[in-house]
């Protein structure tokens, strides 16, 4: 990746680039793009930006005030590895043309404001994030929703239901089975080469890869672990990681999804988020307390637990998210913390070096907009530090198997998107500090997500026929 405007212009020349792709992320977390020929691109674009219609993005401006600017970040430049014509990609901030400031609903601008807010508090100067997005790769998927009815069909040769099927190339018989994907070698793991190609492309684009493997679900669930980084850069990387994964799968004739729960009866996909806060080169999470944590880290955990249900609206932003957040599928529903205990929603991983001390928030999923999610987690944690919110005693036991009287004492994450949106509506002050999230943005976000809730509520489901048709 390039570092300066001069580097970018050099990339364009050396690679005979034909188009420049300006990319930005919408509220829901989907990257959008517009391409311009290099004949209409010069270094002035980094000062003047590229105009576009903001009213076309759900939850953004109305048509009466829709002019917006895409302001490219030269540090994000790379040559797209999938386009046939040589194309330079630039990640952009969305700014107001009237004053050049970041648009209050632009996720990347929100992430930048979160980083600035951390510094302004004097509590720390750098927040590191390390997400672990899991994903499924299917051979194909078909669905339809209309007045006649609805259906979805997942096609996966690796899935247990394919053991009795005939395939043109034969049926190898080697399959992981339900919850058996973590993690036998090939030929049971059929995605080794595809994941390796994804990793090589990620590294060529400047994202360090640490590990890749099959995940638990036996229908093509996978994970590629990449390195942590600062808030905005790590959010940029997460968007690029999803882009590479989906496009490599596409070149193989497969389809990759980051839906949290596409399969009934097997594990869903999470996106655990590792976090730490530093100041003057020192890890503020390292200390002499429980599991080597500092008081700062414990208060940070306390803030996340206190605001977890409001956070769910951002970290688990789909109706499908809450089909994952149920007991029995390794989903972290209990709002507790523990060292190495994966049944707690916040885990403190073992590290040999205090520099690596961090916490792992386990309830987020890969539908999460990384710019919004990382920012919200940071704001919740900082609220805990500023208000000295202690999380209580650690939960060093299996939270999936507690006696009823103990189980009732431990709070849980939300059980639906609409519940989480209600919590967000009533618990938002920690997000609006320093102007990081605006009330206008949160109102628009809640309205946008309630449209999803309403659509889901109004759609008759096949399970309802199974339960009620003959009564």
From Swiss-Prot:
Any one GO CC term of the record: cytoplasm
Does Isomerase count among this protein's keywords? yes
Which residues are in the GS beta-grasp domain?
15-100
Write down the chemical reaction(s) this protein catalyses. Answer: 3-hydroxyaminophenol = aminohydroquinone
Q: How does activity depend on pH?
A: Optimum pH is 6.5.
Which GO terms fall under molecular function for this chain's record? Answer: 3-(hydroxyamino)phenol mutase activity; glutamine synthetase activity
Q: Which PROSITE patterns match?
A: GLNA_1, GLNA_ADENYLATION, GLNA_ATP, GS_BETA_GRASP, GS_CATALYTIC
Instruction: State its Enzyme Commission number(s).
Output: 5.4.4.3
Q: Which GO terms describe its biological process?
A: benzene-containing compound metabolic process; glutamine biosynthetic process; nitrogen utilization
**Which terms are listed as keywords in the entry?**
Isomerase
Residue ranges of the GS catalytic domain?
107-471
- Which InterPro entries does the record cross-reference, listed alphabetically? Gln_synt_N (IPR008147), Gln_synt_N_sf (IPR036651), Gln_synth/guanido_kin_cat_dom (IPR014746), Gln_synth_cat_dom (IPR008146), Gln_synth_gly_rich_site (IPR027303), Gln_synth_I (IPR004809), Gln_synth_I_adenylation_site (IPR001637), Gln_synth_N_conserv_site (IPR027302)
Activity regulation (record text): Is inhibited by H(2)O(2). 1,10-phenanthroline inhibits the activity slightly, but other metal cation chelators such as EDTA or tiron have no effect on the activity. Divalent metal cations and hydroxylamine have also no effect on the activity. Due to the relationship of the protein with glutamine synthetases, glutamate and glutamine were tested as inhibitors; neither preincubation of the compounds with the enzyme nor their addition to the assay buffer affected 3HAP mutase activity.
Temperature optimum or stability note: Optimum temperature is above 30 degrees Celsius. Heating to 60 degrees Celsius for 1 minute abolishes 72% of the original mutase activity, and no activity remains after 8 minutes.
| Listed Gene3D superfamilies | Glutamine synthetase, N-terminal domain, Glutamine synthetase/guanido kinase, catalytic domain
Q: Pfam families recorded for this chain?
A: Gln-synt_C, Gln-synt_N
Its domain of life?
Bacteria
Q: Which family is it part of?
A: Belongs to the glutamine synthetase family.
Additional note from the record: 3HAP mutase requires neither a cofactor nor oxygen for the enzymatic reaction. This indicates that the enzyme catalyzes a Bamberger-type rearrangement.
Q: What is this protein's function per UniProt?
A: Catalyzes the isomerization of 3-hydroxylaminophenol (3HAP) to aminohydroquinone, a step in the degradative pathway of 3-nitrophenol. The enzymatic reaction is regiospecific since it leads to the formation of aminohydroquinone exclusively, without producing the isomeric 4-aminocatechol. Can also isomerize other hydroxylaminoaromatic compounds, such as hydroxylaminobenzene to a mixture of 2-aminophenol and 4-aminophenol, 4-hydroxylaminotoluene to 6-amino-m-cresol, and 2-chloro-5-hydroxylaminophenol to 2-amino-5-chlorohydroquinone. Does not act on 4-hydroxylaminobenzoate.
In Swiss-Prot or TrEMBL terms, this protein is called 3-hydroxylaminophenol mutase
Protein source organism: Cupriavidus pinatubonensis (strain JMP 134 / LMG 1197)
């Amino acid at each position: 990746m390039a570092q300066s405007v001069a580097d970018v212009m050099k990339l364009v020349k050396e690679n005979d680039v034909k188009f420049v792709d300006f990319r930005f992320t919408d509220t829901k977390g989907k990257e959008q793009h517009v391409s311009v020929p290099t004949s209409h691109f010069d270094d002035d674009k980094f000062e003047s930006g590229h105009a576009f219609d903001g009213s076309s993005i759900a939850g953004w401006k109305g048509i009466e005030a829709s002019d917006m600017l895409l302001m490219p970040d030269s540090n994000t430049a790379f040559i797209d590895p999938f386009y046939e014509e040589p194309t330079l990609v630039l990640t952009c901030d969305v700014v107001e043309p009237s004053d050049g400031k970041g648009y209050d609903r632009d996720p990347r601008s929100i992430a930048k404001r979160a980083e600035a807010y951390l510094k302004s508090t004097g509590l720390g100067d750098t927040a590191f994030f390390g997400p672990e997005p899991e994903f499924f790769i299917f051979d194909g998927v078909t669905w339809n929703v209309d007045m006649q009815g609805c259906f979805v069909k997942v096609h996966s040769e690796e899935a247990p239901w394919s053991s009795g099927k005939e395939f043109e190339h034969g049926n190898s018989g080697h399959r992981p089975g339900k919850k058996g994907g973590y993690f036998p070698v090939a030929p049971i793991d059929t995605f080794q080469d595809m994941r390796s190609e994804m990793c090589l492309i990620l590294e060529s684009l400047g994202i360090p890869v640490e590990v890749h493997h099959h995940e638990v679900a036996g229908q093509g669930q996978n994970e590629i672990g990449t390195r942590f980084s600062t808030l905005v850069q790590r959010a940029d990387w997460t968007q690029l990681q999803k882009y590479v994964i989906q496009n490599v799968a596409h070149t193989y004739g497969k389809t990759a999804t980051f839906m949290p729960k596409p399969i009934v009866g097997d594990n869903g996909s999470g996106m655990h988020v590792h976090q730490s806060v530093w100041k003057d080169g020192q890890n503020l999470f390292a200390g002499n307390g429980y599991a080597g944590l500092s008081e700062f880290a414990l208060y940070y955990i306390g803030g996340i637990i206190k605001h977890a249900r409001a956070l769910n609206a951002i970290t688990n932003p789909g109706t499908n998210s809450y089909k994952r957040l149920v007991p029995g599928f390794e989903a972290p529903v209990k709002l507790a913390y523990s060292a190495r205990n994966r049944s707690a929603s916040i885990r403190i991983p073992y590290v040999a070096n205090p520099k690596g001390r961090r916490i792992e928030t386990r309830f987020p999923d890969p539908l999460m907009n990384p710019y919004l999610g990382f920012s919200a987690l940071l704001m919740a944690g900082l609220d805990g530090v500023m208000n000295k919110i202690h999380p209580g005693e650690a939960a060093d036991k299996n939270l999936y198997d507690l006696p009823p009287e103990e189980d009732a004492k431990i709070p849980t994450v939300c059980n639906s998107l609409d519940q989480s949106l209600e919590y967000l509506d009533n618990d938002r002050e920690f997000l609006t500090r320093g102007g990081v999230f605006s009330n206008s943005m949160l109102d628009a976000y809640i309205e946008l997500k309630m449209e999803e809730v309403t659509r889901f509520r109004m759609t008759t489901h096949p399970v309802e026929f199974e339960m009620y048709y003959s009564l």
